Amino acid sequence: MDKRIYIIGAGFAGQTIASDIRRKKIFGKVNAFLDDDKSIIGSTIDGIPVLGPIDSVTSILSNSDLDEAIIAIPSAPTERIREIYETLVKNGFNHIKILPGISQVIEGTAHLVQTREIDPLDILGRTPIAISLKESLNYLRGKRVLITGAGGSIGSELARQLLSGGAERLYLLGHGENSICQIFRELKVLQTEGVGEKATVVPIIGDMRNREYIDYIIKQTKCNVIFHCAAYKHVPMMEENQVAAIENNVFGTKNLLDAAIKHKVDRFVLISTDKAVAPVSVYGVSKMLCEKLVLEYAKKANKNQAVMFVRFGNVLGSRGSILPLFQSQIKTGGPITVTDEKMERFFMTIPEACSLVLQTGGVGKNGQSYLLDMGEPIKIIDLAKQIIKFSGLEPYKDIDIKIVGARKGERLVEPLWLKEENPTATDYPKILQLENKEYEDGRLDTLLQKLYPICFYTQGAEQDFRNKEKLVKLLCQDCQSLKDFYEEIKTDGQKRTDIL
């Protein structure tokens, strides 16, 4: 018996998905559209009946374990998607897919290959802002675009969205061959299925720390625009590998900026983080220094270049982040571990953050700092409860929540900006501009000169190589918030023999 498929939403997206299923013939049969539009309920579209309203008709459908529902309403707000999902689950649907809505709703395109299993990202948080990708990506038409860290969560989503940008070439740079291979293959499949435009996609394996190789890559690719996402980012891991954090994040960024200025790259966009604000971890300091580098190199840019950074908070679903961790803990029966009942974070979905980054890359000016409006913070314990419920379970009854205390480099609240940065609205929704907080002349260069022999073997300074105690001392001398945080931890009696 063919799998019966119910498509939620009989609009353009739903009809296109139905057409794809009919053409491919191997995914089952579309049994009906479900829709709330009274003007089409009771009609047929290409021989497929339209039933509704969604909430009412779902309860009387006869469905088996094989049957599948596809939510194809990319314009629907998050609250409505959540309601539809809960209705489907309540009425016995075990297989629920969704057509993500960031770009499809704007461009009027939809493809079966873009559907995926629904996950908590689709029903958590606020409704993402709708951005016209084709309009915001006009500055990339016919250009060569390079993404560093293209195999990561942000880099790979930028690559997916850039398929709609009309770029001539899309370079995927990363040091992990598996992740680069994965996104490269995914983009090729999307292109084969008609998603986006026919950019030439080129995978490149390389290490940001290799100055000569990075210079060679930028020269050879003749890229016009760089989105710099590559970074070591896991805070506790970087507290155990402090030299590596500075070596890769700071000097890798410097290498890329040197090459970008030298080879006249038109636009350079650094992806930054709220952990760069009054940092309390080596990772946070590394990203703060990357921001300072961008402001410094903007002064070296010629009149046709624009060097900028875009800062934002946590994204839901990134690798190694809280959401995948909670999901894996639920799969093993719990408990879910939460740092503190008061801990809260700003969250945004990866597709929304990337759409705003791409828009900022086009409208941003040289030497400017930008911040994405993250909305209101969410308590981590509330997020844990929502994810447990999404899994069809009850918090504390089926899955326990355990308070475990802060890890190295963590704080209960992450500020998005310093008071003196004074964020102001721009002409573009959810994109704020910051007042630059630059180092005085010579301060950054002096610090980097002292950090260099710690990160890279240097004749005459062999004793400094990989000396993390000296590295942390230098960082604490430069960054008061890091020094204060480490001293507070030491006072609290926590063991920090690795750094103090």
Region annotations inferred by a language model:
Residues V202-V225:
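Conserved Rossmann-fold cofactor-binding substructure of NAD(P)-dependent oxidoreductases
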